[in-house]
Amino acid sequence: MIHEDLFAGFDPAMVAAAARQRAADVKETRRAVAQKSANRHHMRRANAEATLAEILPARFADGESWHVATRGDIDALSYVRHILAGVSHLDHLLMSTWCIAKNDLTEISAWLDAGKIEQFDLYAGEIFPGSYGDEYEQMLSMCEAYGARLIVAKNHSKITLASNASEAYYLTVESSANVNTNPRIEQSTIHASRNLHAFYLEFFDGIKSIDKHSKTH
């Protein structure tokens, strides 16, 4: 129960409108809803990956941030699929994740083959070589075949950087979700900001791999 004193000084019409919107959101939790605020932040909810195309723009305007709360089959790679649908290609894709599945690496390989991605860098957690042996070997093969880079570190961050310099398009996805799909509730924010992209890129460029086999890639 929200105490009425919290809204003292606010326009009653705005408070009533917000309350109606909140009631509608609670009632229809299984349907994607949207709300736009004045500072160019956008909020979305999604229950399945197919919903992303309905609730997110094909391209993100510079300076916008889109906040997405999910409780379905959406992971970090879901956003990459959506981003790729709105550009000719990506010069660079960097993904930082605790873990990644074989089918995800296979899909990324197909994008590299098709020229949809020129350079792919994967930052994985220290468990990756030992606990995900097949995926680790697959990624090493991608390093040889495509010039991809694997950096193994004490990493638990979930960041995706995507860029197309010729289109001055720089995106950063901050997320709780790993690359591999799971049914858990996750939250993500997509930022169209060259400065934020550069901030994270500089940070990740400074990380050295602790894995002897991936150091040379």
PLM feature spans:
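N-terminal localization/anchoring segments of enzymes in phospholipid and broader phosphate metabolism
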Residues: 1-90, 113-115, 202
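HKD (HxKxxxxD) catalytic microenvironment of the phospholipase D
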Residues: 4-10, 93, 147-204
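A generic structural signal for short, solvent-exposed coil/turn residues
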Residues: 60, 85-87, 114, 140-142, ...
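Generic alpha-helical structural element
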Residues: 69-72, 97, 189
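Primarily the HKD phosphodiesterase
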Residues: 76-145
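Short, low-complexity, polar/charged sequence segments that are solvent-exposed and flexible
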Residues: 112-116, 140-144, 167-169, 191-196, ...
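Cysteine/selenocysteine-centered motifs that mediate thiol-based redox chemistry or coordinate metal-sulfur cofactors
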Residues: 200-217
